[in-house]
Every structure is written in C-alpha cells, then in structure tokens.
C-alpha cells in the first residue's frame, strides 16, 4: 500500500484501524510535510509582490528548498511503513533453542537500530523545516503570518512525535552505548528546534494579538 497515494479519508481510516501501518512515525512525517507546505505557501503568497521585492530572491530560494523538503518528508511516510516489516519479522522469530534465541536477539537488535533511522531522518527534515519557517515568518507576507505560525507548530509537533519513535526502539536495544548515542542525537534536535519553533509561534502570536 502506497501511503501517500491514499486519499485523506482512506489514510485516516487506515491510521485509526488496528493495522500496524501507518502509525506514529509515518504520521509525524506527514505532519512535517504539511508544516513545510504551509511555509511554502507563505512564500508563494509573497513572491511577485512589489512590497517584498527586496526579499524576492531569498523567498524564491526558500521556496525551492521547501518544495524539495516537502517531497522528502512525503517519501518518509512510506519509508516508515516499509521499515516496520523487518522489525515485525524479527519479533516473530522462534527462540525455542539457545541458537534460535541468539539468532533472534541479533536480528532484533539490527532491526531496532534500523527502525530508528527513519524517525531520526524525519526529525532532521523537520528541524530544517523549522529553520525555513523562521525565515518565512520574518520575510514573508504579513497577510500570511498566521500560516507561518501554523507551519512552525506543525513542524514542532512532527519533530516531537518522531522522537518518540526513536525512543521506543532505543529503549529495547541491548547495545546501550549505541542506544545512548541515538538518544543523544534525538535530544540535541529536540533541545534546539523545539525552542526555535516556539519562538516563531510566540512571535506570530504577538503580531496577531497586539497592534
């Protein structure tokens, strides 16, 4: 099943079902893509306007990157679903003998490590999305400033949601040194970019609520 080819209605129905995919990781990627798309919309509402001629080149560059970033996050919706199969297969391996148990442990460890890769990439893309949205909020059309704030909120939510999909896998890893390294990378992204997204949201809120 190609997740990004589903209608909104079908995707949500699948998400609500007991099917293992789509799940939190794929949804995080989709929400991140929506956040980046909103930022891109701000840019497209800004370009070509005389009032913003001084930042036209900047906005055009932002739009080019935002368009590519959205597509990268869309691809990660499917990548997350694809990554679940090896993990599920690993959990299903027999462990009746010492040899089987050792084999299962090795395969599961590898699958858990691999399962962290997609949500970490989602986080990295969402972090980049937040950086783009900072510029859209600062340079984009004031008529679309609320959309820039929404974009920041969505990218932040996706970043945080993806982090949980890292932590659920690192918690189960036998190699605690490797798990700690992945957790540290995740924490670093959270520590920096949650604050940056919050700053954009606060700035936009201030503009909307104060004359």
Model feature map: region roles:
Residues 3-6, 121, 168-169, 197:
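Polytopic transmembrane helical bundles with strong interfacial aromatic enrichment
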Residues 3-21:
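Short, hydrophobic/aliphatic alpha-helical segments
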Residues 17-38, 144-162:
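Conserved phosphate/anionic-ligand binding catalytic regions in large, soluble enzymes, centered on
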Residues 38-58:
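Phosphate-handling active-site elements
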Residues 51-89, 189:
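A structural-propensity feature for long, helix-poor, extended segments
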Residues 79-94, 197-211:
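Long, charge-rich low-complexity segments
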Residues 80, 84-153, 157, 169:
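Amphipathic alpha-helical interface segments
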Residues 129-132, 144-204:
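Preference for long, well-ordered alpha-helical segments
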